[in-house]
A protein has these predicted regions:
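Bacterial N-terminal signal peptides
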Residues: 8-17
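Protease-domain processing segments flanking chymotrypsin-fold serine proteases, especially trypsin-like
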Residues: 20-97, 211, 310-323
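Serine endopeptidase catalytic core focused on the charge-relay Asp
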Residues: 73-88, 96-97, 104-224, 228, ...
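A residue-level detector for well-ordered beta-strand positions
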Residues: 92, 238-239
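Functionally engaged cysteine thiol sites
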Residues: 28, 48-52, 56-60, 66-67, ...
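C-terminal subregion of chymotrypsin/trypsin-like serine protease catalytic domains
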Residues: 31, 217-222, 240-323
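Residue-level recognition of alpha-helix boundary/capping or hinge positions
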Residues: 65, 107, 136, 294-301
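Bacterial N-terminal signal peptides that target proteins for export
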Residues: 1-9
Length: 323
């Protein structure tokens, strides 16, 4: 979630996020994390307030377990494998474009990182360092960065790569899946996923809007669609995935915090969706749709003459690629 959330998260996770621990796919680094510090104590305190984040009747952001992965859909398994921690937020592997392995996250996560961190994939048991930041753009709260991948892991990642669904508009009621490292009821930042009945698109409209976080709102606006997915601090940078096709259709960026009692009733949510209530623009979670990411980056390629040639060609390959 957005700038306000990242401020807290980057503090919470610094003790573990920047440790020199690494591994490759299938050969994870199993050294223990450090003992609890003041920052991890802060994480635990924040995590106890999960009710502030809940949308609908139940908190649906649940740990991803080996048992779940053994019976989950291929779309779910793929999404879990490509999701990583990245500093105080989340990132996800998109694919290899013009010879570069690209990850996506939020602008507000990347702006605080400066390519210092590792992308740590819990399910794959691998960690890859940031090599280059291609850019981060506040109006879509999106960032692209390149990771260094050893040759031995190329084949593994190639099978998992999936670009955004750039050409498909969102539809109200479209079922979603979000997987990230939010800390609500999760102070250890395990991988958690939400695919409950409320996690769906509530608006086929896209609006430029500010951050509705009442605790610590961010300073800029981003193009947004409303959704009912449970997300918390630490989920910043998570892909928003079509639950049926497995295609990334956007990226989370913020949400109303704390949630109102009305937004914590699934029956009320159903009524808001049915009637197109204006409350969906005040009370829920908000993501940036893939269609708007494509539109804005196309404009940047046309207008930003400061981009180096390699970045331009990589962005062009990213925007032109289709699944």
């Amino acid at each position: 979630m957005r700038h306000s959330i990242a401020r807290i998260l980057l503090l919470v996770s610094i003790p573990t996020a920047f440790l020199p621990r690494s591994g490759t796919a299938g050969n994870p680094d199993t050294r223990p994390l450090p003992q609890e510090s003041a920052w991890t104590s802060l994480a635990a305190a924040i995590a106890r307030s999960a009710e502030d984040y809940r949308i609908g009747d139940d908190w649906g952001k649940l740990p991803v377990t080996p048992e779940q992965l053994a019976t989950a859909t291929p779309e779910f398994v793929r999404a879990a494998k490509v999701t990583s921690t990245y500093g105080g937020g989340t990132a996800f592997y998109i694919g290899k474009f013009h010879g570069h392995h690209l990850m996506g996250t939020n602008h507000h996560v990347q702006a605080s990182m400066n390519c210092r961190g590792l992308a740590r994939f819990q399910v794959l048991g691998a960690a890859y360092p940031c090599r280059k930041v291609l850019g981060h753009w506040p109006e879509i709260d999106f960032a692209l960065f390149e990771i260094t991948v050893p040759a031995s892991d190329e084949a593994v990642l190639a099978k998992l790569a999936k670009n955004f669904s750039f050409d498909r508009p969102l539809t109200a009621g479209q079922l979603l899946l979000t997987i990230g490292h939010g800390i609500a009821s999760n102070p250890g930042r395990r991988l958690v996923a939400n695919q409950d009945s409320d996690c769906k698109v509530f608006s086929d409209e896209v609006r430029l809007m500010g951050d509705p976080d009442e605790y610590n709102p961010g300073e800029y606006q981003a193009w947004s669609f409303a959704n009912g997915c449970d997300v918390s601090h630490g989920d910043s940078g998570s892909a928003m995935i079509d639950r049926l096709t497995g295609e990334p259709v956007g990226i989370i960026w913020t949400g109303r915090i704390p949630k109102s009692s009305e937004a914590q009733s699934s029956a009320t949510l159903d009524d808001w969706l049915r009637t197109g209530s204006h409350e969906i623009w005040k009370q829920l979670s908000y993501g940036v749709p893939a269609t708007k990411i494509h539109e804005v980056l196309e404009g940047i390629l046309e207008s930003d003459t400061s981009l180096d040639r390699e970045t331009v060609e990589t962005l062009r390959a990213f925007l032109d690629s289709r699944n």
